Amino acid sequence: MEEKELKNGYTTGTCATAAVKVALEALIYGKKATEVDITTLNYTNLKIPVQKLRVRNNFASCAIQKYAGDDPDVTNGISICAKVQLVKELPKVDRGAYYDNCVIIGGRGVGFVTKKGLQIAVGKSAINPGPQKMITSVVNEILDGSDEKVIITIYVPEGRAKALKTYNPKMGVIGGISVLGTTGIVKAMSEDALKKSMFAELKVMREDKNRDWIIFAFGNYGERHCQKIGLDTEQLIIISNFVGFMIEAAVKLEFKKIIMLGHIAKAIKVAGGIFNTHSRVADGRMETMAACAFLVDEKPEIIRKILASNTIEEACDYIEKKEIYHLIANRVAFKMQEYARADIEVSAAIFSFKGETIGESDNYQRMVGECGAIK
């Protein structure tokens, strides 16, 4: 039976942006939209239906129904809402994210951050940088130099209940869901379909250019980091969580060199010998980080803090001996090469959420030079 093509959806961040745009245009222009055009962070143009719009003298609110496509997302079908209010001066709100002409606040059903290590500071609403960027872009476009300022409250009526079915409580995001999105699009694929797609892409790259080396990255962060440091993105493939499968694919297609670029939160799993990095398959992040900390002679109290950390980013805050990242990069390269059981060489570089390279394997610079991987 031919496998059906799965439908993509849009993120909570895209929904929040759409709700802000509809509400603000209603308040300023009197426009009562039934659908709204949104351009996502990866420049995808969407036409999103409006679920509900309410306008009063000094504020407007809008609800957008979350659509996850064929992705198994617990937020699918819930309402993501925005209330906008025009003011002359922005009030002081502890949880708010402030910009020149607006403040973005998480209301009912949007979580707030209580632990370090996330992209949002402790005490702030769990509205990530990607959605904030989309929202402020819409506000700037609509206000277009006006002196007016906007109080934006994002709220999710079912958010508190839905959050209990996510990792938010464990991650220290309390009281609701997070408003997320690095691209604005939710890509849906079955595991088999995704693997077939990645193998086909890798095969084309091998046969089209006849190069025997490849760059692996876990996702969007890795791709952006590849661009930032000047590596040849035409030789880069996104491997998602499927490290082991893609190593096997590279061996089958007779690649001789793999350059692995990975965020520390994913790379640490590979350093521990985990070759499917999905959170439901295996974890061991803190344990592997603690073991590496022991090997570079970190203090016992730091190792205890690492083991008790909520995220790897938090654990990294405790690290004093930065050579740990060199060790981790070497472990990633070694474990991947060991897994391959073939005549293939692996090098690795790891980076932080800030996009800084924090560790390289011993052979990384040599391999990059030999491959001509710098554009």
Swiss-Prot record:
Pathway: Cofactor biosynthesis; adenosylcobalamin biosynthesis; cob(II)yrinate a,c-diamide from sirohydrochlorin (anaerobic route): step 6/10. GO terms for biological process: anaerobic cobalamin biosynthetic process; methylation. Pfam families: CbiD. Keywords: Cobalamin biosynthesis, Methyltransferase, S-adenosyl-L-methionine, Transferase. Its EC number is 2.1.1.195. GO terms for molecular function: cobalt-precorrin-5B C1-methyltransferase activity. It catalyses: Co-precorrin-5B + S-adenosyl-L-methionine = Co-precorrin-6A + S-adenosyl-L-homocysteine. Transmembrane segments: none annotated. The keyword Transferase applies. InterPro entries: CbiD, CbiD_sf. Belongs to the CbiD family. NCBIfam families: cbiD (TIGR00312). This is Cobalt-precorrin-5B C(1)-methyltransferase.
